Amino acid sequence: MNDYKCMIASKEMINKKWNQELAKHENKELWKKFKESSLRNLENRIVYMGILIEEIITECTAIISSNDLDMQNKENLIGDKKAYLTAFRTNKEYEGKGYFSKLYKFMEKDLKKRGFTSLTLGVEPCEVRNIQIYFKWGFDKYIKTCYEYYPNGEKTLVNYYEKTI
């Protein structure tokens, strides 16, 4: 874990990571739309990445402004002192080894330093393992349940939770 570093990603790093995601997913058009959404909202988001020996292995995005053009279900999820966390990703071979937890702690500390007092996130009800992790991290205040819609027309049910920091 000594070679693992957490940081705020540059635009170059964000592009590199999106190109990696595009390369490993079959539905290229959907992932191209996710990339476009991310890049057009950079002024409203902070992207955090975990690097292990020059490889991006974890990432998470904090949406910090309600001006974000693509965030869905914004009501009660984002505000002046409230950030919405999304796009939690860990490369498969590094899951369950504590890397994402370290990135999450780095991100929470940074957002608190920036004046945020609460964080929100969304999780599908079927993602039991993730729900347990988020509860352990303090995301135990239920906010609401809504559908999120993907660019390809699919929809998924999402429960939203909040944590005070």
Which role fits each region the language model picked out?
Residues L111-G122:
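Conserved GNAT acetyl-CoA-binding A-motif
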Residues T90, G96-K109, K136:
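Conserved acetyl-CoA-binding loop-helix of GNAT-fold acetyltransferases
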Residues K24-I53:
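Active-site rim helix/loop that mediates acceptor-substrate recognition in acyltransferases
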Residues C60-A87, E148-G153:
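Conserved acyl-donor/pantetheine-binding loop and adjacent beta-alpha core of acyl/acetyltransferases
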Residues L121-I131, Y147-G153:
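Conserved beta-strand-loop-alpha-helix junction that forms the acyl-donor binding cleft
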Residues L39-G50, T58-E59, N67-D68, Y84:
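A short helix-loop-beta-strand connector motif used in the catalytic cores of GNAT acetyltransferases and
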Residues M1-K16, Q20, I165:
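Conserved N-terminal entry element of GNAT/NAT acetyltransferase domains
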Residues Y134-K144:
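Conserved acetyl-CoA-binding loop of GNAT-fold acetyltransferases
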